[in-house]
Every structure is written in structure tokens, then in C-alpha cells.
Amino acid sequence: MGKGPSRSMVKRSTILLGIFAAALLVWMAGVLVKYQIVNYNYYQTRAIAQQTMDTTLAPNRGSIYSRNYTPLAISAPVETVYIAPNSIDEEDRRTVAEGLASILELDEDAIYQKTLKKNYYEMIKRRIDAEVADEIRAWIDEKNLEGVHLVEDTKRYYPYNSMACHILGFTGTDNVGLDGIESIYNEYLQGTSGKLIAAKNAIGTELPYEYETYVAAENGKNVVLTIDETVQYYLEKHLQEARLEQKCIEGAAGIVMNVKTGEILAMASFPNYDPNNYYTITDQMALDALEEYGQEERKEQETAFRNKIWRNKCIVDTYMPGSTFKIVTLSMALEEGLISTNNTYSCPGYIRVADRTIRCWKSGGHGHQTLAQAIQNSCNPAFISIGAKVGPTNFYQYFKNFGLTEKTGVDLNGEASGIWFSKFQEVELATASFGQNFKITPLQMITAVGAASNGGKLVTPHVVKEITETQEDGTEKVVKSFTPQVKRQVISAETSALVCDLLEEVVTVGSGKNAYVKGYRVAGKTGTSEKIDVLNATGEKYYISSFIGFAPADEPEYAILVMLDSPTAGEIYGGIIAAPVAGDILADILPYLSIQPQYTEEELETLDVSVPSLMEQSLEEAKALLIDKEIKFKVKGDGDTVLDQMPLPGSTMPQSSTIILYTGDAKPSKNITVPNLVDYSVAGASDRIASMGLNVRVVGNSNAGSTALVISQSPAAGEVVPEGTVVTIRTNSSVGVQN
């Protein structure tokens, strides 16, 4: 029988075993410390992730409203489709891919590859409409599928498409603002996301509803703009029409602003885009330009055109303001007492400054003129003389005081500051006096003119009126308001009033006469500036044609700027092509803005009246009614009852028109051929139409009398119409408005 282990051997084994056990315990303690203390948060997060499934609940993005609470940007409920690959049975993967690809019009193989992943979330498609979501639900039920889910989401809509697009901006696929108000006020608009936390079992399947935790999303706040959708509509309408008619290859820009508060009622820039599909080029002039490029160049040019349509020319692009800047030169010289209405100027068509000869736009010169006439004529030599009196130091100080060396501070992104001279001496002062060889933005220009007209106060322009929060009862609670900010007093109220008087005469008898609006006192200044930088770079001559003004001239409330960039249709002068646009806009918006007209007796005769219904009335009753309304008439036929009339009831006609009353067997017949009236004077066209038994309506913004010419007509020349038809002629003046 063999001997067992010796006592010493057992002792050694026991000691070794004890050491091993102690080491094991130390190691286990270390592991426990590592997992439960040192890396507790990490492993807790992993454990929770394995036991729960989080779904982010998107908040409703706040709306953007006009000042009248008309929705300009809204979020509508949609749904997002995603899959949980770990929850999809092996035999269902191809079915899931085929079905989703068919319903959502996506690539089947791409979806199938997502079903093979070992996770619990793969996004398939975001923001699908309710009808598509319902189709997916029906398909899930029909196929009895697991792992295909729909979750609530929101989609941004812009009900008015491209209207005010450069102010509103747009959002990206994640509903985060990328430009405009959507970007600047994103922190207010976006809200706070919620969560749906669902428990799941060991194989990744969701547990019943009672194991869910729901954290509600907090919806975003609403932004109320100073923009008036009606004013915005008219600004865009007339600006786009002018841009197309004048073939402005670099677009157009326009602003309507309250001169007292700095509130921007409308701001438009062309070319523009639809924020519902901001990546798509829809502007027809841009699309036509792209057709000139081959397939290889087109992609590169499309990128350039997208950048162009996204640019807000009102605040991003700088330009030479030309003669519209004479308002600022006039204001500073009057404020300093360096000139008065008693000053006179002589213009031979040029002026010598140092070693330069600077010419007036009128080659023969304006001759002897008063200060008022120099402004009406937009005489360059006169304003060079005025600028010289101010001097370079004082001139620059006023330039700075009018806010032209800094950004306006408008609550929009991308605002540029102006470009001033690197040196400012005698020649530079001369060209600056009439708005050449330096650059500012359109918004800087209208803000400066606002100060010149509102009593001398420089006001910060803004587009946001207030931030609101929608209450449970649907009402809006204001959580933040934006009040007018006056930066400084630039000129005195007395100087401002004199500037207004002088600029009103520019519109009544001067270069701005095409901006005249019946019944309203409009003041303003035209401008035509050469794009010197383009000339130097390419050798080609292009111009900026503009008009800036305000109304009412005796108590200014609203300023307007119209800028046409690089017109190529033939005319370039602001007085000819920009002033009429401003006049058309003002004619539409001033009555809407409750500015009451005050008509002269001559204007009253040209106003439209509603044509009364006289048919089936006795001839004597019809005559009495027309006599009472002071409307002229002519009777055809020998009956006692009015059987027909021309113009027709419910239409409109000028007060001075004649109504034809048909009685007995007499009937209106189309027997008069409308003549071609284009290029006729207003008087000549009116006389010819009247001699043919037709009525005339004169529209347009000309207060130029005999110098106004017909530029279009309706009905067109050659159309055959009945006696008494109203022929509308549109007029414009090209005399004395070339600047």
C-alpha cells in the first residue's frame, strides 16, 4: 500500500489553493468595481439599450405668420417609416423589401440590405403623406409583418409657394431652418423633441403597451412678421412684370417699409424660388439661361443659379445707388445750412473737377436752374457743386450718420455692408455726390431715405413683429415683442420737411413724374447707375435702374424702393422703367393701407365709376338716373324702354365716359375697329377714340400731360368692338425722366 501525500505537501497545496482563491476574489472584486462603479454609466446605458427601444417624437414646428396672422409657413402632420431588422423574421425580409419599395417607390435591394442588419432602427422614408401611411398599415396587417413601424412626424409647407421666400427661408430634411427666418429664429420655431420608450424582451420584440413611457414633444413657438401679404403680393407682381418686360438679366429687388417704425411690409428679390422645393430651379428666366449650356456645363451652372436664386438682393447684393443718393447729399447740405431754396446753378452739360471732366446725363446741359429745378432735373454738375460745399470730411460723417458704413441690423441673415472709397478726395467726393463709385445695399438706401423723410430719425429696419405661443383654446399669447429702435437723429425735422417738399416736386413735374399716382402726394427720386465693375471686368455696359420714394409726401408713412438690375430690352433710365413700377405698386397699396386719396378736379373726371344697370327701365327713368350721377349718355332707337346698354352693367368706366342706351329695334353691334394707339400722345389718342364713338381710360403713372405717350392698349389694335366700349391706354413719359 502506497504512502499518501506528506503533510508538508498538503500544506503547500492548501497555501497555493488559498493564494489562488484570494487572487480570484481580488480579480472578481476588480471586475465588479470596473463594471458597477468605474464603468457603471456605460454599462447601464448598454443594458437599457438592450432592454428598451427609444423612438424620437418630433415636435410641431412653430408657424410663421404675416402681420395679419395669415400663415406663410406651417407644419402639417406626416409620418416616417422605419424598420427594426432584428424583429423581422428571416422569411419576411424579402417581402418587407418588395412591399416597401413598391409603395414608397424606392430601390428594393437597398431596403433588403437594411433588413439584414443586426439593429433595431433603420429609417426607410421620412415625411410620407397620410394616404401612403394608411396603405402601409393595411399592407402590414395583410402580411402579418413584424418590425415595420410608422411614427408621427411633421412636414414644412409654404402655402403661398415663392411669396416672400427670401424672408421666410426654408428648412432641411431634419426640419431645422437653413435660411431666412426659419434659420434665424430656429430656436423659437423648432420646439423640443419628445420620446416614446418601449420595453423589449430578450429577442428584441416590443413588450405590451403598459411597458411604454411617453414623453410628450413641446411644440415650437410662432413667429409673426411685419410683412403684409397683400403688400408683398403687389410688390412681387409688379416687380416681376417689369423684370420680364425689361429683360433684367441680373434680376430685380424691391422693398416697402414704414419710415416711422422700420417695419418692412414687403421685400422681394428676383430670381426667386419655391421653399417647398428649394433645390429646384423654377424661375423661367433662369431656366432659359441654362438652356444655353451643354450637358457637361449645365450641372456646374445649375449650382451657380441655385446660389443666385437663394440670394436676397435687398440685403446681400451691393450696388451703386446713382441719383437716388442725391436725397442724402441734399439732406446733409440743407442741414448744414450750406444751400437753400434760393440757390441757383448753371449746367453747361459738364463740370471740371481737378483734372477730370465729369458730364451731366443731359449732354446739352440744363442751363440756369434753381435748387428745386436741379433736383427735378437730377443735374449731376449741380450736385457735384453741392457736395463740394459739404466737403469730404463732413460728407463722410453724414454718410456714416445715415447708417451707410454699417449693416442696418435687420433680423435677416447674410446682410452685407457697403463698399466705400479707399481714398476720399476731390474727385471721389464729386462722384459720390451723385451716387457713383461706391456701393451700398438696397436696404441701406431705403433706411437712409426713411431718415431723410420721417423727421430725421435713423430707424433699424426689421421683419419680425412678435413671438407667440399657441394656447389650448387656439388663441395666441405674445411671449416676445419687437419695438422700433431709433439709432440716432441724423437731420432736423425742419430739414426733413423741406426735403420732402422738394422731392414731391420731382414726382409732380420732374424726373420722377412716371411714379405719379392720382389722388396721392408721392415724393421720390429716380436713379440710373452704370455698373463700373462689370464694365472694367468684361467691357460690357450694364446699368441699375431705380426709383426710391415715399408717401404721403406731407406726412410720410411708407417708403418704396424699386431696383431693376441690368435691363436689356432697350430702356435703361430709372425715370422711364423703374418709376412706373413704383407708381403701380403705390396705386395698389396706398388705398389698401387706408391712406385716403385727395383728388383734384381734373383727377375726379378720370376716376372709374361703376356702370349702373339700366336695362328694362323706362328711358325717362334711365335718363334721370344718369343725370343725377352726372354721367353722359346717348340714346339709340325710338323706343320708350332701355333694352341694352354699352358699357355693360357692373363694369367700370371713367366718370367722363358716355353710356349708349339702346331702345326699340336698336342693338349694339361690333362694327368699330380699334386703331393702333401706341406712341400717340394721350391727347391725340383720346381724341381719336372719342371721334369713333368709343370711351377712353388712361392708366399709368404719368403726370406729364402732353409729353406722355401711349405704350400699350386694350383691346388690341384690330379688334372689332361695339360703340361705347372702353379702350384702356397705358401711358409713360420719356421726356425729362432720363435719370
PLM region spans:
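Periplasmic/cell-envelope proteins involved in peptidoglycan metabolism and beta-lactam response
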Residues: 1-289, 309, 318, 393-403, ...
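Beta-lactam-recognizing serine transpeptidase/beta-lactamase-like catalytic domain environment
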Residues: 73, 201-212, 260-324, 328-564
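Extracellular/periplasmic catalytic domains that process cell-envelope and extracellular macromolecules
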Residues: 73-75, 157-161, 216-217, 247, ...
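Acidic/histidine-rich, surface-exposed loop or edge segments in extracytoplasmic proteins
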Residues: 75-83, 115-120, 213-223, 479-482, ...
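Short, well-structured beta-strand/strand-turn elements
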Residues: 76, 145-151, 245-246, 342-344, ...
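Short secondary-structure junction motifs
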Residues: 145, 249-252, 340-342, 407, ...
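Ligand-recognition elements built from short beta-strands and adjacent flexible loops
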Residues: 471, 519, 533, 541, ...
